[in-house]
């Protein structure tokens, strides 16, 4: 039994501390043990067998492995107990993630029986960078409702229930909390890497741009859906540009553009330099070409740029570029684009208020536009420099204006044509052709077909002047002899019209003859000749005839000179004997010649017909009189009202 000498009744009779000395049974001079010899010097011989270096058997290896495994489990359990001791709550983990905290720190059984478990918060990963994390366990995540911790104590009270818990958790996860000031200390390279790791880089760049410049990028640009659509003006926003590149960008872009408006924003939240530039290239480019060009000049990836065409119809966007161009924050080279000047100069703004139909009609008349589609398309393209065209585009009655313009232009053209004689008309058509051709190919082609030129010239003279009984010329012959090519080239030069018997079921098929100087009926068949023999004898005579017009009253007209092509020779058939005296017939028996390259040997073009009529004007009785040798003294047509000057 152990010795009971000691302090068993400590603290029962008094309050406080007192010293107790240990009792030693051995006295000086006594031998400690019988088996110990103090006279023997310590030579270390007793430590010879301290290390067991005997060969290890197979059973010993298994026992040693088991011992190592048990020791490792014990060490791991001790570390886990230490971690649990210093955790303020199962929902607060050094990892900073609720999911990992619950999975790693709480046992599965305890997690299964928990009754009041807090819902998991929705998280949104922003920038994944290992440089931000301290321990390297994972990437930082920012919660939608961020839990802010100060001095190791969460604001929502999840730090534990006891004082000991709070004291033990004072120094825990504050090293994982990164404030905004700490994140802003990262380099520009880190910011660029963060952009690359974003799920939607384009949306991030739009947000960065609005933070930098205080307005949305879409306020200045319109959107092109396709990357292949070309445009001359482009707005580009670039992020993460190095300062050395920014200094030389102005000179690098000059050979490619005629106008540049450059704005630099330096060191915005360590994002590097941010570029906003409006460029007008020398040639139109698409978005892909602009991206490759500027990525090379700025030395940044293509997905770090926003590239869209500017809003040329927005006065707000034009005012922004104008105001920034006169400030010291921009570098501007070249002439200001017309769409900016048009919307920022007072005179242009006053002129854009109202649309004048007379100016549109005058433009269509001067440029020979009578088709509604041509008028609408061509006049809309003038909106960049014509204030009246811009007002036309801003109007809600564009279709009505186009229809009215085409109608008025046709009326003016028809009245002008009816007022001219055939001599004046040929001169008018010749003045529209700038080239000087050769009349000989036409004569050579007629000789190739076996037609006597003098006879053809005399009958052509009667046909041009609309002589009765000589008002119709028919050219007949086998296929591929050049009948249609010859007549079509002549009608094109004279500005005539073409009628088709295919519409004979409608009695309006002759209506184009009302507004024509000459006409052509191509490829007349047996039924067509029968119709002409039955209903059109008076028309072939060149006498006045009543023509029915659609949605209009009957018109009394004199048939214009008429050309007819056909494969049928009416002079060989008895039933067309009443047309013999009304139709002048020429035969084309020979095929139309072509060279080895497939080109026509005899060129029948407008320039050659112009030279033909100018050369043979005397023979055709269309030469200018002596009074007209000095030029046309008539005033040009003008439908725009002039300014009346009133004297005082």
UniProtKB/Swiss-Prot annotation:
HAMAP family in the record:
PPV_E1
Q: InterPro entries recorded for this chain?
A: Helicase_SF3_DNA-vir, P-loop_NTPase, PPV_DNA_helicase_E1_C, PPV_DNA_helicase_E1_N, PPV_E1_DBD, PPV_E1_DBD_sf, Rep_E1_papillomaV, Znf_lg_T-Ag_D1_dom_sf
Function of the molecule: ATP-dependent DNA 3'-5' helicase required for initiation of viral DNA replication. It forms a complex with the viral E2 protein. The E1-E2 complex binds to the replication origin which contains binding sites for both proteins. During the initial step, a dimer of E1 interacts with a dimer of protein E2 leading to a complex that binds the viral origin of replication with high specificity. Then, a second dimer of E1 displaces the E2 dimer in an ATP-dependent manner to form the E1 tetramer.
Q: Which GO terms describe its cellular component?
A: host cell nucleus
Q: Give the reaction(s) catalysed.
A: Couples ATP hydrolysis with the unwinding of duplex DNA by translocating in the 3'-5' direction; ATP + H2O = ADP + phosphate + H(+)
Known post-translational modifications? Phosphorylated. Sumoylated.
Provenance organism = Pygmy chimpanzee papillomavirus type 1C (PCPV-1C)
List where the motif Nuclear localization signal lies: 83-85
Site of the Glycyl lysine isopeptide (Lys-Gly) (interchain with G-Cter in SUMO) crosslink?
A: 558
Q: Answer whether the UniProt record assigns the keyword ATP-binding to this protein.
A: yes
Region DNA-binding region: list its residue ranges: 184-352
Q: What's a BP term from Gene Ontology annotated to this protein?
A: DNA replication
GO molecular-function terms, A-Z: ATP binding; ATP hydrolysis activity; DNA binding; DNA helicase activity
Could you list this entry's UniProt keywords, alphabetically sorted: ATP-binding, DNA replication, DNA-binding, Early protein, Helicase, Host nucleus, Hydrolase, Isomerase, Isopeptide bond, Nucleotide-binding, Phosphoprotein, Ubl conjugation
Q: Please identify the protein, giving its name as recorded.
A: Replication protein E1
Localization: Host nucleus
> What family does this belong to?
Belongs to the papillomaviridae E1 protein family.
First-listed, main subcellular location of the protein, grouped into a coarse class:
host cell
């Amino acid at each position: 039994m152990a010795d009971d000498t000691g302090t068993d009744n400590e603290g029962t009779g008094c309050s406080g501390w007192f010293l107790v000395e240990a009792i030693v049974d051995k006295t000086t001079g006594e031998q400690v043990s019988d088996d110990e010899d103090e006279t023997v010097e310590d030579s270390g011989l007793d430590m010879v067998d301290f290390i067991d270096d005997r060969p290890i058997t197979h059973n010993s290896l298994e026992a040693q492995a088991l011992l190592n495994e048990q020791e490792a489990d014990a060490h791991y359990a001790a570390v886990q107990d230490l971690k649990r001791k210093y955790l303020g709550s199962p929902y607060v983990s050094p990892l900073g993630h609720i999911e990992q905290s619950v999975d790693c720190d709480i046992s599965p059984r305890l997690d299964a029986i928990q009754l009041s478990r807090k819902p998991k918060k929705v998280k949104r990963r922003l920038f994944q960078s290992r440089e931000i994390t301290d321990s390297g366990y994972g990437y930082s995540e920012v919660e939608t409702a961020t839990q802010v911790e100060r001095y190791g104590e969460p604001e929502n009270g999840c730090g534990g229930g006891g004082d000991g818990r709070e004291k033990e958790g004072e120094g825990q996860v504050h090293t994982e909390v990164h404030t905004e000031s700490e994140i802003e200390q990262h380099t520009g390279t880190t910011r660029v890497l963060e952009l690359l790791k974003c799920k939607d880089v384009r949306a991030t760049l739009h947000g960065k741009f609005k933070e930098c410049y205080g307005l949305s990028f879409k306020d200045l640009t319109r959107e092109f859906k396709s990357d292949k659509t070309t445009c001359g003006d482009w707005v580009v926003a670039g992020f993460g540009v190095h300062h050395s590149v920014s200094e030389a960008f102005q000179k690098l872009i000059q050979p490619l553009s005629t106008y540049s408006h450059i704005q630099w924003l330096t060191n915005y939240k360590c994002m590097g330099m941010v570029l906003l530039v409006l460029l007008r290239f020398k040639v139109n480019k698409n978005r892909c070409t602009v991206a490759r060009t500027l990525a090379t000049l700025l030395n940044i990836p293509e997905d770090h740029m926003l590239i869209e065409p500017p809003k040329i119809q927005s006065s707000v966007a034009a005012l922004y570029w104008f105001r920034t161009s006169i400030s010291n924050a921009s570098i501007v080279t070249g002439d200001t684009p017309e769409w900016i000047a048009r919307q920022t100069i007072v005179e242009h703004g006053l002129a854009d208020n109202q649309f004048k139909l007379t100016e549109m009609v005058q433009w269509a008349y001067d440029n020979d536009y009578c088709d509604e589609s041509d008028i609408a398309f061509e006049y809309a393209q003038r909106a960049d420099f014509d204030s009246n065209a811009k007002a036309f585009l801003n109007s809600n009655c564009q279709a009505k204006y186009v229809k009215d313009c085409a109608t008025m232009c046709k009326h003016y053209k028809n009245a002008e044509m009816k007022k001219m004689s055939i001599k004046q008309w040929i001169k008018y058509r010749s003045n529209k052709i700038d080239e000087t051709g050769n009349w000989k190919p036409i004569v050579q082609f007629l000789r190739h077909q076996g037609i006597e030129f003098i006879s053809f010239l005399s009958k052509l003279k009667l046909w041009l002047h609309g002589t009765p009984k000589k008002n119709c010329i028919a050219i007949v012959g086998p296929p591929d002899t050049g009948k249609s090519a010859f007549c079509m080239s002549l009608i094109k030069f004279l500005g005539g019209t073409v009628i088709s018997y295919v519409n004979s079921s409608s009695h309006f098929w002759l209506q184009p003859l009302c507004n024509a100087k000459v006409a052509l009926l191509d490829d007349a068949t047996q039924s067509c000749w029968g119709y002409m023999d039955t209903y059109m004898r008076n028309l072939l005579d060149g006498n006045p005839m009543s023509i029915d017009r659609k949605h209009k009253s009957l018109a009394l007209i004199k048939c214009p000179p008429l050309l007819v092509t056909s494969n049928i020779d009416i002079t060989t058939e008895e039933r067309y004997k009443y047309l013999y005296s009304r139709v002048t017939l020429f035969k084309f028996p020979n095929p139309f010649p072509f060279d080895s390259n497939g080109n026509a040997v005899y060129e029948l073009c407008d320039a050659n017909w112009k030279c033909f009529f100018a050369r043979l004007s005397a023979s055709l009785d269309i030469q200018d009189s002596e009074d007209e040798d000095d030029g046309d003294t008539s005033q040009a047509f003008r439908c725009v009202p002039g300014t009346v000057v009133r004297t005082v």
